[in-house]
Amino acid sequence: MNKHVMLCVGSATQDVFLGGKVFTPECEGEVCYEHLKLGDKLTVDELTYATGGNAMNAAVTFARQDLETHFIGLLGEDPAAQAVLAELDKESVHTDGVVSSAKYTTSYSVILLAPSGERTILNYHGEPLSSQPDLVDEANIKGD
């Protein structure tokens, strides 16, 4: 019987969630806005670090289903990359297809959480995989 091997190619992100009463949207009809005064220093009530990104989330999901899973993506050599790699390792996702370089910066998101559960995401997209097209080719993908 052939064992399925999952290959997840794409983004991995470190997320930081900031929540609290300071994020209270003002609504104009059905559209709500968060108004943050420039120059203010705001205190948040909640701080949570996590990891995500489409390919990383898929890889973790498959690994939790006891499928052999490999992640291919570009990461920097920064604290966000360390968090991503630690989480993938904890979840038993193979990272032999990861390319890490000081010339890249790992994707990073700051998620502002309103008490209602609504969120606003500030996202820095790291190096696009399209900048390394040779990273994913048939020679790098092993299978039956």
What are these regions (language model features)?
Residues M1-H70:
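Glycine-rich phosphate/adenosyl-contacting loop at the front of the ribokinase-like
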Residues V9-A12, I72-L74, L113, L122:
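Short hydrophobic segments within beta-strands
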Residues L47-N57, A80, A102-K103, P128-P133:
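Short secondary-structure boundary/capping elements
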Residues G73, E77, A81-D89:
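Short, electropositive alpha-helical surface patch
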Residues E87-Y104:
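A glycine-rich helix N-cap at a beta->alpha junction
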Residues D96-S101, I111-D144:
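Conserved phosphate-binding/catalytic loop of the ribokinase/pfkB sugar-kinase fold
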